[in-house]
Amino acid sequence: MKVVQGDYRGEGLKIAVVVPRFNDLVTSKLLEGALDGLKRHGVSDENITVVRIPGSMEAIYTLKRLLDLGVHDAIIVLGAVIRGETYHFNVVANEIGKAVAQFNMTSDIPIVFGVLTTDTLEQALNRAGAKSGNKGFEAAMVAIEMANLRKRLRRDVFESDSNGR
């Protein structure tokens, strides 16, 4: 039996972080957490690309462009979609979630979903470092692990299958 998994060594990895300005009180804290996680685990400043966008819906376009460039080992998308009085919350939350899932099914580069979908600003702030940890930091850990898993799958599974069969 072969077990393949990633690890948390970020040295040499190139990571993009897409973060909206909308709900900046929350998203800036998510970004701080993500950058802290990446740097603590060895991803250097020169290998981190932060892309600031207006809102979460613009992440879909931005993710597609970053995937087309193909220079990153993983991409993190952050955001905070907070329920309001209209149906807009549902549209934004559903569309960004569907887009990330679709890109993950069709791309070779892992995209990590770090978009908070909450009922209140307080819930969002709690998940951005106030009480419940920082989901940006957690997204950084997932990005590093998935980037390393991607490399290992190529090396340990693909190469051994193509050489051995």
From Swiss-Prot:
Its EC number is 2.5.1.78. (2S)-2-hydroxy-3-oxobutyl phosphate binds at residues 85-86, 127. GO terms for cellular component: cytoplasm; cytosol; riboflavin synthase complex. 5-amino-6-(D-ribitylamino)uracil binds at residues 22, 56-58, 80-82, 113. It catalyses: (2S)-2-hydroxy-3-oxobutyl phosphate + 5-amino-6-(D-ribitylamino)uracil = 6,7-dimethyl-8-(1-D-ribityl)lumazine + phosphate + 2 H2O + H(+). InterPro entries: LS, LS/RS, LS/RS_sf. It is an enzyme of class 2 (transferase). Pfam families: DMRL_synthase. CDD domains: Lumazine_synthase-I. The active site is at 88 (proton donor). One of its GO terms (biological process) is riboflavin biosynthetic process. It comes from the Bacteria. Keywords: Riboflavin biosynthesis, Transferase. Pathway: Cofactor biosynthesis; riboflavin biosynthesis; riboflavin from 2-hydroxy-3-oxobutyl phosphate and 5-amino-6-(D-ribitylamino)uracil: step 1/2. GO terms for molecular function: 6,7-dimethyl-8-ribityllumazine synthase activity. This is 6,7-dimethyl-8-ribityllumazine synthase. It comes from Thermotoga maritima (strain ATCC 43589 / DSM 3109 / JCM 10099 / NBRC 100826 / MSB8). The lineage of its organism: Bacteria, Thermotogati, Thermotogota, Thermotogae, Thermotogales.
